[in-house]
Swiss-Prot record:
This is Outer-membrane lipoprotein carrier protein. It is found in: Periplasm. InterPro entries: LolA/LolB/LppX, OM_lipoprot_carrier_LolA-like, OM_lipoprot_carrier_LolA_Pbac. Monomer. The gene is lolA. Participates in the translocation of lipoproteins from the inner membrane to the outer membrane. Only forms a complex with a lipoprotein if the residue after the N-terminal Cys is not an aspartate (The Asp acts as a targeting signal to indicate that the lipoprotein should stay in the inner membrane). Keywords: Chaperone, Periplasm, Protein transport, Signal, Transport.
Length: 208
């Protein structure tokens, strides 16, 4: 599920200094200012370690500050992920199941968190290396399940991102029809619980 959240690419020279990494991270943060809200179509291609295509798909992605996320895979099998800034909902229509998680616990495990987070604490968990129009984001935690996320821009517009996991699978997402979130689109970030579904609530409970 981490990979889906990334929904959902490396090779950084060892001679790069910490200052260079910091500058690259700041450049990415500056670029993301222009992506404060985004709605886009995506096409997904997943290849294994042998570069064999093992999955394709398409759908809609939306992002908005602060901490709002919408992912709707429409083909080949429907699934949906919605984050309202507090909770994250994962809906599998085929299984008729909804999983609810704490937003911070779920999204912070993924470098995609940087697309919806602006706080220094979150950014300090990743190293960023700029390569032409792309930025490679690597988690500092060795057990994250993700090796690298690469996000690419053209004229400051997010055009694609790739996710490489620790099993060698590469998920490539090509974006099109990018738009700024409208007032009507804000409803995307409010999950409406379907009827007659099983609910797996994994949110952390406050202990009395």
């Amino acid at each position: 599920m981490k990979n889906l959240l990334c929904a959902v690419m490396l090779t950084s020279p060892l001679l790069y200094s910490t200052a260079v990494f910091a500058d690259d991270a700041q450049q990415l943060r500056n670029t993301l200012v222009n992506t404060a809200s985004l709605k886009t179509d995506f096409k997904q291609t997943v290849t294994d370690v042998n570069k064999k295509v093992i999955q394709t798909g398409s759908g809609i992605l939306a992002l908005a500050h602060p901490n709002q996320f919408y992912w709707h895979l429409t083909s080949p099998d429907e699934s949906q992920i919605v984050a309202d800034g507090k909770d994250l909902w994962i809906y599998n229509p085929f299984a008729e199941e909804v999983v609810i998680m704490d937003f911070a616990e779920a999204i912070n495990a993924s470098p995609i968190a940087l697309l919806v987070h602006r706080d220094d604490t979150t950014w300090s968990q990743y190293s960023v290396t700029k390569k032409q129009d792309c930025y490679d984001i690597r988690p500092k935690a060795i057990d994250s399940g993700i090796v690298t996320v690469s996000v690419c821009f053209k004229n400051s517009q997010l055009t694609k991102f790739n996710v490489l996991d620790d099993k060698g699978n590469l998920s490539q997402f090509d974006l099109s029809n990018q738009k700024v979130i409208t007032t009507e689109d804000k409803a995307l970030f409010k999950f409406v619980l379907p009827e007659n579904v099983d609910i797996d609530d994994q949110r952390l409970k406050t202990l009395n």
